Amino acid sequence: MKLGLSKALLIFFWIVGLSFFSCKKSNELHPVKLVGQAFGTEFHITYYDTDQRDLTKQVDSLFYLINKSLSTYLPTSDISKINKGDTSIFVDAYFKEVFQKSEKVYNETNGIFDPTIDVLVNAWGFGPQNPLVRPDSLKIKELLTLVGFDKVQLTNGKIIKTNNSIYLGFNAIAKGYAVDVVARFLESKNIMNYLVEIGGEIRARGNNQTRKSPWKMGIEEPNFDGTRSLKKIIELKDEAIATSGNYRKFKIDSISGKKYAHILNTKTGYPSQNSLLSVSVIAKLDCADVDAYATALMAMPLEEAKFFLDKHQELKGFLIYSNNDGNVETFATSNF
């Protein structure tokens, strides 16, 4: 009997031991990395998951739905149909949220951030493959009558425009919003340590479990020659960051040799002329929000951008600009 009892106890402790190590193993976080193309750029997603789930198909499905709603490069998307004058479209939840976020930043920046400016962006030839075009002053004046997000309303699920020729484009916020959609999806799967990056717009939560430290990323030097180097390394602690700059997206007049930035002044219709080279915004907000703020700040004069950041303490800002002597300087908010 004693031998039988001892054997039974051994079996019991062996089973308990197996269960312990099995549980320990199942709670271990493993890194998963997804890399691909979306929205005309690359995306990089890193997350830690006990089951090492490959969520590529689900993420691709989310990108498909966002494109179907918001891509001006897709002729069959809801926004493309609306831009062509189709008034029968009931917009989806993605469209509604981006519209509402855009409206908020439009009002806060007194129209400097404006999704209706794309009619002029297109006129200047700032599309991906288009050559630079210099529209004359009369053409710019004519197109400016179509600019103003207050001329567009979201009513009962439909977009109402005061002029059917008004052209909507959410490119300045869409990548950041796509980052948010993926981040929310990961959280719905109980994944709480991740970094999602699409075209330089980033949202992070938790930590880099491999290094046992906060997520880190770099802010680039504004190099016009195409080379890439880092100006500053920062940590993200449950935050999002977006950077807007004129050192990559610009076109050169073949006759005068003058550089034209892709960010337009929504009041004049001409490319913004200021000393800013790069604006990075960090906040415990959605990536779509900081994406829109970074775009707006990049279109402001330097002192106006500083003033705006001072008024919005929820935002951390890092500005890279050219001083009067042509030398590169930086400005960081006190909370950066």
Locate predicted features:
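Mature catalytic core of soluble alpha/beta enzymes
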Residues: K2-A8, F20-F336
